Amino acid sequence: MEHSTPLNEEIVHKKNDENWVIAQKKVFTNWCNIFLNQRSQKIEDLETDLYDGILLGSLLEILSGKNVILSKCKQLKTRLHYINNLNFSLKFIGDEGLRLVGVASEDITDGNLKLILGLVWTLILRYQIQSMQNSKSSQQNLHSSTKPSELMLNWVKSQISDYGHHIKDLTTSFQNGLLFCALVHKLVPEKLDYKSLSESDSLGNLTLAFEVANKELGIPSILDPHDIITTPDELSILTYISLFPKVYQQTLEPLNNNNNISPSLSSSSSSLLNTPNKRNSIQLSKSTSFEQQNQQQQQQNLLSPNSYRNSISFSKSPSFEGSQSTGSSRSISPISSPIKNSTTGNSNLSKSTSFEKIEASNTTNNNTIIIAEESRVIEKIVEKIIEVEKIVEVEKIVEVEKIVEVEKIVEVEKIVKVDDIEKLTNLQDQLTEQQQQYQEKSLKLVNLELELQEKSNQLVDKSNQLSTMQATNSELMEKIGGLMNDLTDIPTQDIKEKDEIIANLKIESEKNLKCFQDDFNALQSRYSLTIEQTSQLQDRIKQLINELQERDDKFIEFTNSSNQSLADNQRVIDQLTNEKQSITLQLQDQQDIKEKEFQFEKQQLLSQIDSITTNIQEYQDKFNNLQQEFNTQQTLNQQETHRLTQQLYQINTDYNEKQTQLQSEIKDNQTINEQLNKQLSEKDKEIEKLSNQQEQQQDEKINNLLLEIKEKDCLIERINQQLLENIDLNSKYQQLLLEFENFKLNSSKEKENQLNELQSKQDERFNQLNDEKLEKEKQLQSIEDEFNQYKQQQLSSNSNIDQQLQSTIIELSELKEQKELNDSKLIEKEKQLQQLQQEFDQLNEKNQKDHQDQLELLEKQLKQLQQEYDQLNETNQSIENQLNQQNLINKENLNEKEQELLKLQNQLNQQIEKIQFDQQEFSKQNSINIELVNEKNEKLIQLQQDYDQLKQQNRSNDEKDENDLIEKENQLKSIQNELNQLIEKNESDHKEQQLKQQSIENDLIEKENQIQQLQSQLNEQRQQQSNQLSEKDQQLNQLIEKNQFDQKEQQLKQQSIENDLFEKENQIQQLQSQLNEQRQQQSNQLSEKDQQLNQLIEKNESDQKEQQLKQQSIENDLIEKENQIQQLQLQLNEQRQLQSEVSIDNDKILELEKQLKQCQSDLLKLNDEKQQQDKQLQDKQIEFDQLQLTFNQFKNDKDSQFIQLQDDQKQQLQSIQQDLNQLKQENQEKEKQLSEKDEKLQSIQFENQEKEKQLSEKDEKLQSIQQNLNQLNDENQEKVKQFSEKDEKLQSIQQDLNQLKQENQEKEKQLSEKDEKLQSIQQDLNQLNDDQIKKNEKLKEKEEQLLKLQQDFNDQQSQQLKQLEEKLSEKENQLQQLKQENEINQLNQQQQSNEIIQQLKDQLLKQQQQEQQENNNEKEIERLIQEIEQLKQQQEIDQSELSNKEIKIQTTQQEFDQLSHNRSKDQLHLQQLQQELDQLKQSFDDQDHQFKKVIDERYNLQLQLEQSTLSNNQLDQLLKEKLKPLELDSNEKQKTIDDLLSNISNLQISLQNDKDLISERNNSIKTLESRITQQLSLLDEKDNLIKDLQQQKQQQQQPPTASSSPSSSPSLLSSTPTPKPQRPNQIEIDRLVNEIVNRNQDLIRKNKTKFYKLENGDYIVNSIIYRLSLDDDNDSDLIAQEYENGNSTTFEKSLRIFPSKNTRPIFDWRALFFIGAAVLAISTLFSSSRPIKYEKPT
């Protein structure tokens, strides 16, 4: 189980990555703070504190000592200013010579930690470690290692060599802390006891070393000991160690001054700069590129620690590269002349190359003439050289493979062991030694070659075989030039390794050269006699060499000029790329801001979801608690029922005893009760009326509120539907974007001029987008105004509610006053009761009868109480059921909300997946583009190979004459020019591809920005929904408060009713007092019976005691009931709390409704944006039409240029014919002169030379003509490509049509889904109706219960009155006590009853509200059904319109298909014509070749004749040498001369025939040109037809746009501003302009200028307006003021010329695109000497 799983390995790897990042962060922050403390600044967190660029700028100023950056920075709190500040500092770093790859200002503001660490590391390398390289103490051990890690290791080793430590690397070796202690101990031995340290206590060692270094040496403790023990990082340790050398230098300066250190680093760099050759400049550029690559590796390897350290440990310093590059740069030193090279010797030659061999062979061949027999030997030698070179190439490949294998092994060993680094340094030393040996051997080779040259100078060839030997020399030159090309093709980075291979090859070539030397020695012995004969021909050869050098100089000048033009083009391209980079930076900023907003909103949503889940759990807990409490209450209720049954049993016993006493009182009370019942019935009717009125008012209010709530619910449903539609629209929008990208890619294939125009149009589009943003902001402001109006309406409604509340408060105050009055009345009545007590003693006898009646009433009351108790239990159960139902409903609602949130999250995830998929596709496209580029590069390589093959073929064919060599050199130059053109084209194609890739990347960035915008809009919609729901909740709370106020009003009214009832009771008491008075009269009559009454009183006292006991028991029972009522009140309070929580949920629902409203507004915005996008598409179509117009203009210009070229070619051919005729005449004259005298031959030679020069010039003209023809062919191919692009655009239009069909199908599906939703809504309505019926039944039951409770309450009050009458029979003291207790009990009971009634009324109100909500829902559903029917009707109308449009589109497609078919035919016809042209060109080239051969033969004959004229003896010798094998006589010599003359005449005849052939060819070319012009005219007609069709489509699909492109026709003058009255001097201006136009009509016709006059007197010349005047005119001043104030709507895209001296000319850069061919005409119109005042634009 020792093996670790891959999962664990991954976890460990991640932890290690995190650890080294944290360690480097600590060290680099501490390093920065060392320097920032000078300005009392500090970095606390490196990841975030550099965001504004101020700290970074101050750090760079401190390090460099240049106070340049902070003066430019601005301390503003915006992202753009932060990025601008950071750009200043990054630019400063680039100016200092450092290159940062992948680090941008946005990365620093966003806190990309790894890139920030890379930036700081580059600063450490530059300003700390590289500065140490220049110090004396650090240069002692720099010969073998120049990398930073090796440099520091060697320095540490040199300083701590006495301590006996074995140092391997910069990580594990420093873990125990002993090395740090040794470094400190060397400087401060008295402060640190080194011998007492142990390796095991690593933490103690490290802390001690850091503390002593900080206190004693002033080296700040950057490192953390714990980080070094756990994760030792190489870079952090390297930065800390780099602080020591300065301290060592200060303390140990006297010792170090004695050591003389060799400046090995600087010498190599100086040798680089002193070499003047081109090869040296190449080496320098490549060495700098190598340094840049090392810096790139160091910055990129921050992502992983291992690769990061390897890149540092094996990176090379620039000085070491310089020393190696000099070795390769010495090989190419300039050679002034062949004679100087022979004298200068070894001093000027540092390294032998193949190029020097060429020139050496030229010098030998120029100074010697070799005999024909020895040429064969030389050919064999050349063949051997070629074989050796092949063998060398094979060995090169084998050795390169070996070297690659060795490099791989070395890389493996680097990872395994660090000790192998020293081996690599040794290998580098060996390489340098081998290079020195190679240089020595190359010098030896040069010496040997010089000896061969001296020996070959002695070789002499005869005059007849001079041409053959020169041909062989040319072959050698070309072959060795091919070798040079092969050598130059080898990459400069591999030169160091391949120089060793070349050295070995040179050793082998020396052996071969020794063999050749023996052959040359043999040749010297044979041809020593022929040296004297070559002296005369040397002068001729020197002249030819000088001519070649002049031609080379011309070619070099041409290459320099072409290089300058290429450099200018590259500068323009760099400017464009910089502009694009700035735009991309802005887009990236916007993208980052939107991403952060999206993440913030996402976190808010997640927090809301968490809060909702916590609320749900709280509700569930509360519900469980309520259930438990309810169970406890049930048990208590059962106990109370048991007690009540016992009390009933006791009361029944008392009842039987007192029946007899109450019978007498019943009769008297019956009459009184009848009267009271009548009064009560009347007042009950009045109360019912009042209550009905109040209920109606409340019902109306509740119904209105419910209607509003239902309307909002309908809006929410609509918004949800619109959200779904928006999602579909977004998907369609993405498809449109993809199509638009394809369109962009197709359009980017056009020429660079069109790209520039498109860039200008993109700027205009950017302005349009800004305008659109302003429009959107205006729309938002309008929406906010509407929202404010809605708020004001709500405030007005709230004010009305407040007024109602105030009115209710006033009523309450009035009721309170009435209560106070009633209390005063009660006091008076108590006094009356005291009077009645005295009379009550007399009526005891009658009261006994009344007691019986009271007992009966008590029994009834008990029964009623039981009934009420049962009813209360039922109501409690019903309330609990309702609460359970409400809780269930709330749970369901919450679950639904959670589901909606999950759906939204799924949608977001889907969008993110789509984005990832788009990115993958983009990466695939990039890979495809890269493959295409590689294929093109391969094709280039093949072209180069073909070029080499052509060279070899040309070499084999050109073995005869020097003239052939010269001609073929010209051909090679032309081929090189073509190759350069091809390379330039390839480079331009590559740049175009890069531009395309950048455009694709920009498009992807725009897509991502749009997606993020959509996501932000969705989040805003959600927030708006939440706000809407919160508003709804607030409205519901307001309604609840209103209901509470209404309930309070009802309570007050009930209290007033109760007071009325109390007054009635008082009236009843008054009646009783009247009765008592009657009884007093009776008592006077019964005074005689007092004795009997006394006896009865004694009995009554005993009875009263018994009653008191019973009353006490009853009072105890009442107290228990009161406790129970209090418990019920607590339960009710808890229920109210639950209701409050439900109200909070309702508030949240209102907030969601607000969010839905905001979603609606956003949807409207999206629709507006979609309309704007449609407008943009329309604008693009208009731009497409403009491009077509420009294309037609371009085509016309090209046709005119083609015609001019044809005319020029005809003129050149005529001139050539004339020159040929002249040559014929001259040749005839020369033949006559030869026949007459030999002396005239010399003069003829000079004339022939001049004519040969003329012929060469004419040949060059012919080559230029051929190049022009090739260009014309290329232009035709480009036109074909443009036609293909148009076809692709038409295909894209067809795709758009198909997409419209798919959209219609999707809309039909959506309608079907809506129908299904309607059916489901109808089902829900039926269910709601059933629920309403049930609820109405429940309400009726509850109303009945309320009526019963009221009746029971009245009964209880009557019973209490009877009990009071019974108690009056007792004594005064007892009666007073009983009265007080009874009053207290009455008040408690009244309060309890009022609370119960209020609760029941609240329930009723809630049920009524629910009913009203359901009614409102029904109404809204009916509205929705009506709207859906309207939508269906609209859809039918849209479908009919779409069908009509499809029919029109089909017709246009048919027409377009026909046109495309015709176009394809035309293209085939064009291809056939091109093939014919190619055939003619080939035949023409063949004839030219034949013609050249004839001229060459003629030239050779003339040379022979010239040589014969030198002297008769020489001529005889030449003839003898030629005719040795035949041994001709003197007579035969004359015959040979005659034959030569006849050949010359034949040549002249052939020249005439060639001229005839050329004329025929010209005629055939003219016929072909006429055909091409006809076909081009047909193509123009077809293009016009296509444009007409496209304009018809635009008129069908789009409304006519207001903007019109500038044109030359006078119909466009209607779009110009309103005409002004003509000026006073207009007549003179018109006269002068007409004179100028009449003078320059020819030039205007050539340039095809279009000239019109406006009604206000201005002139339009090729869409450019010119205003002319003879006097100072105020109009120009007004126009200038308007333009400066921004009122330039009528003057855009125009170039105006004003006459007055005070005003400035207005110049718009866009007008330059429309000037075109009118420049010459304008210059002629306004350059005359007439007194027209004008100012030309700058």
Swiss-Prot record:
Induction: Up-regulated by cAMP. Keywords: Actin-binding, Coiled coil, Cytoplasm, Cytoskeleton, Developmental protein, Endoplasmic reticulum, Golgi apparatus, Membrane, Nucleus, Repeat, Transmembrane, Transmembrane helix. One of its GO terms (cellular component) is cell projection. It comes from the Eukaryota. It is found in: Nucleus membrane; Endoplasmic reticulum membrane; Golgi apparatus, Golgi stack membrane; Cytoplasm, Cytoskeleton, Microtubule organizing center, Centrosome. May function as linker between cellular membranes and the actin cytoskeleton. Required for normal development of fruiting bodies. Belongs to the alpha-actinin family. This is Interaptin. It comes from Dictyostelium discoideum. The lineage of its organism: Eukaryota, Amoebozoa, Evosea, Eumycetozoa, Dictyostelia.
